[in-house]
């Protein structure tokens, strides 16, 4: 089994505000869960490489508006969380210097695909663009948040948000009330 790094977001309930973002190895996830307060909920994105842990005791981070490039992290890749105007978390991806520059210049979200090793504009092929309303960063500048106006859906599986299911006890999934705005074509 190949090891991969996953993104963990702690989210304060009921506001769904971001409390922290960290990266861990996938095999550390089980141990990480043991450090969380009782009664947490777990939402997982479509690719199972980002996990939201939700709990009332998590304290939200303070964010500030930014127009500066953030160049930290491995290979100068910075985690980027896309949220809508209501604060709903839509997706998590990565940005490099070029994607951040294009996002600032064009007003539309651009990211860097680690698997394809290339720059991409969200919605370039689907038309499901993300118009940037503002770019935020926590005071420690460890990641970025793009607050966006999402066209149709953020998720390639047709859901408005990539976080459309909750992991229940064990490996059971519960679909969340996230609108499915289209059915992807079978290739």
Curated annotation (Swiss-Prot):
Recorded GO MF terms: phosphoribosyl-AMP cyclohydrolase activity
According to the UniProt entry, what is the EC number of this protein? 3.5.4.19
GO BP terms: L-histidine biosynthetic process
Q: Which UniProt keywords apply?
A: Amino-acid biosynthesis, Cytoplasm, Histidine biosynthesis, Hydrolase
* Pathway(s) the chain acts in: Amino-acid biosynthesis; L-histidine biosynthesis; L-histidine from 5-phospho-alpha-D-ribose 1-diphosphate: step 3/9
The answer to whether keyword Hydrolase applies is: yes
Question: InterPro entries from the entry?
Answer: PRib_AMP_CycHydrolase_dom, PRib_AMP_CycHydrolase_sf
Reactions the enzyme catalyzes:
1-(5-phospho-beta-D-ribosyl)-5'-AMP + H2O = 1-(5-phospho-beta-D-ribosyl)-5-[(5-phospho-beta-D-ribosylamino)methylideneamino]imidazole-4-carboxamide
This protein's source sits in the domain of life called: Bacteria
Q: Where in the cell is it found?
A: Cytoplasm
| First-listed, main subcellular location of the protein, grouped into a coarse class | cytoplasm
Q: Which GO terms describe its cellular component?
A: cytoplasm
The region annotated as signal peptide is none
* Family under the similarity heading: Belongs to the PRA-CH family.
Protein task: Catalyzes the hydrolysis of the adenine ring of phosphoribosyl-AMP.
Q: Summarize subunit and interaction data from the UniProt record for this chain.
A: Homodimer.
**Protein name as annotated:** Phosphoribosyl-AMP cyclohydrolase
The organism is Leptospira interrogans serogroup Icterohaemorrhagiae serovar Lai (strain 56601)
